[in-house]
Amino acid sequence: MLFRSQMVDNPHRYIVGFGMGGDENAFTLEDYAPAFNIAAEAGYPCTVHAGELCGPESIWDAINFLPIRRIGHGVNSILDAKLLDELVKRNIHLEICPGSNLSLSIFADWDSHPLPSFISKGISVSLNSDDPPFFHTSVGLEYINSAKHMNISLEKLKNISLMAMDASFADADTKSRLMNKIIEF
C-alpha cells in the first residue's frame, strides 16, 4: 500500500499525526478506516473532519470507525446529548472554528454558536481559524471574537489554550514547555 510506504515505512520528523479534512458529504469515514488504522498502529495520533456540514451521525461514524483523538469542527454534536456525553467520556477534542461556522451559515450568529455550551459541558475544545484567507480570520481573531461576542472570559480562553496544547500532536517536552508558558501568562 502506497500510504504505508510513504508515511509509515519512511517517517519524517515533521510528520507527527494523521488526519483528513474536506467536504464530509464527499466521502464515508468507514472507507478510510484502513489508512487511519495503519497510521494509529504506527504511533501517529489521528484527527478527522466531521460534524460541520453533516450532522451528529458523522461524528458518531468518526468515533466508532476511526482511532481518533480529535475532530475538526464537530459542532453539530450539540444536536445529540448522548454524543456530547460520549465526547467527554472518550476525551475527544473538538477543533472549533467559529468564524468559518458563521461564514458558512452553520450557525446564524454568535449567540447561537455552541462553544459556550461545549465549555460548560466539559468538552475539550480549541479555537482554530480553519482557512484564514478564505474566512478572513486568524487564531488570534477567533480568540478576540469569542471573548467579545460569546463572553468567553480570559480565564476560559487560557483554559482553551491549555486544552489545545494537551490535544496537540506535539511531543511531551514541547507540550510541557508550551503549557508552562500558557500557565505563566
Locations of regions flagged by a protein language model:
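Short beta-alpha connecting loops at secondary-structure transitions
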Residues: P98-L104, S126-S129, I144-H149
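Short acidic (Asp/Glu) and glycine-rich catalytic loops that position anionic groups and cofactors
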Residues: P67, L94-I96, K121-S126, V139-I144
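Active-site core of metal-dependent hydrolases
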Residues: G17-L29, A35-I106
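Short acidic/histidine-rich active-site segments
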Residues: T47-L53, I123-S138
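Acidic, His- and aromatic-enriched active-site or binding-groove loops in soluble protein domains
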Residues: Q6-G17
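Flexible glycine/proline-rich, aromatic-decorated loop/lid segments
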Residues: W110-S120, F134-H136, E142
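Short, small-residue-biased leader/transition segments that mark boundaries at the very start
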Residues: M1-L2
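Mid-to-C-terminal alpha-helical segments outside catalytic/metal-binding sites
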Residues: N151-F185
